[in-house]
Amino acid sequence: MDLDQWISKVKDGQHLSEDELQLLCEYVKEILIEESNVQPVNSPVTVCGDIHGQFHDLMKLFQTGGHVPETNYIFMGDFVDRGYNSLEVFTILLLLKARHPANITLLRGNHESRQLTQVYGFYDECQRKYGNANAWRYCTDVFDYLTLSAIIDGTVLCVHGGLSPDVRTIDQIRLIERNCEIPHEGPFCDLMWSDPEDIETWAVSPRGAGWLFGSRVTTEFNHINNLDLVCRAHQLVQEGLKYMFQDKGLVTVWSAPNYCYRCGNVASILSFNDNMEREVKFFTETEENNQMRGPRTGVPYFL
């Protein structure tokens, strides 16, 4: 595998061959299987939210935050679906993981799922670009190996969605069997699907999966686990980044600018330096994505 050549190829807008993609997926699975459900990461590191197939904007993200391996990254899932270039997004992230495994951490999001990708675009995109479903199969097999969360210097937990009534301690996340399709309920599901809300404890989620969780729940979780902050993605934020609750114990990071080529939002990434001091960097859509505006199917954004 000539990873550097493949990286250049994908950045130039070409696809790997089906055989090359299969080789890459198998290689990355061997790296991911060694990672913990709560993968320890050292600062300095930059945390990113949903990308959703917006490849040109991902390239702008790297221009904004720095390139791997000079900058370390945690991507909090939802690499695919909705945008037109899910294949390129996931391929380049896998290539960077293969080339610099210690410098990039890839978390699973609710869209890293066979079920959702058959509805929201990734399956159809693979069919269109390869002429069959093999590429989709190779990629969705990798989904099952992606880790569930990361913890920065023991004090900041990164997870795609949010908290679970079944998870009081970080150790309980470590015990989850993750090598499977995302279940429809339970702690694994909740970590992928839950959302913070201006309530005290728990409420039913309008998404039909996960929970709404409130300020008291978040404060208690952070206290029990000696955390300063929970970082998560999963929800569009017009201003790119949003702290929740009076103690600002949780932050939503959103990294897909002008989401779905029509939402008009800015994107952000959240950097932690060696002293865990935070810096937010904002960016807007690229010209390439600007040209992609057009009629979109009426799929609710919050899934």
Swiss-Prot record:
Domain of life: Eukaryota
Cofactor(s) of this protein: Zn(2+)
Organism: Arabidopsis thaliana
Protein name: Phytochrome-associated serine/threonine-protein phosphatase 1
Site (Required for catalytic activity): 81
PROSITE patterns in UniProt: SER_THR_PHOSPHATASE (PS00125)
Family label: Belongs to the PPP phosphatase family. PP-6 (PP-V) subfamily.
List of catalytic residues: 111 (proton donor)
Record-listed E.C. numbers: 3.1.3.16
Subunit structure, interactors included: Interacts with PHYA and PHYB, mostly when they are phosphorylated and in Pfr forms. Interacts with TAP46. Interacts with PIN1 and PIN2. Interacts with ABI5. Interacts with PIF3 and PIF4. Protein phosphatase 6 (PP6) holoenzyme is a heterotrimeric complex formed by the catalytic subunit FYPP, a SAPS domain-containing subunit (SAL) and a protein phosphatase 2A regulatory subunit A (PP2AA).
MF terms in GO: protein serine/threonine phosphatase activity; zinc ion binding
PANTHER family to which the protein is assigned, alphabetical: SERINE/THREONINE-PROTEIN PHOSPHATASE PP2A-RELATED
Function: Catalytic subunit of protein phosphatase 6 (PP6). Dephosphorylates phosphorylated phytochromes, with a preference toward Pfr forms. Plays a major role in the photoperiodic control of flowering time in long days by modulating phytochrome signals in flowering time control. Involved in the regulation of polar auxin transport in roots. Dephosphorylates directly the auxin efflux carriers PIN1 and PIN2, thus promoting their proper polar localization in root cell plasma membrane.
Keywords, in A-Z order: Cytoplasm, Hydrolase, Manganese, Metal-binding, Protein phosphatase, Zinc
Tissue specificity: Mostly expressed in flowers. Also detected to a lower extent in stems and leaves. Expressed in roots.
Cellular localisation: Cytoplasm
One Pfam family named in its UniProt record: Metallophos
A GO cellular component annotation in the UniProt record: cytoplasm
Cofactor annotation remark: Binds 2 zinc ions per subunit.
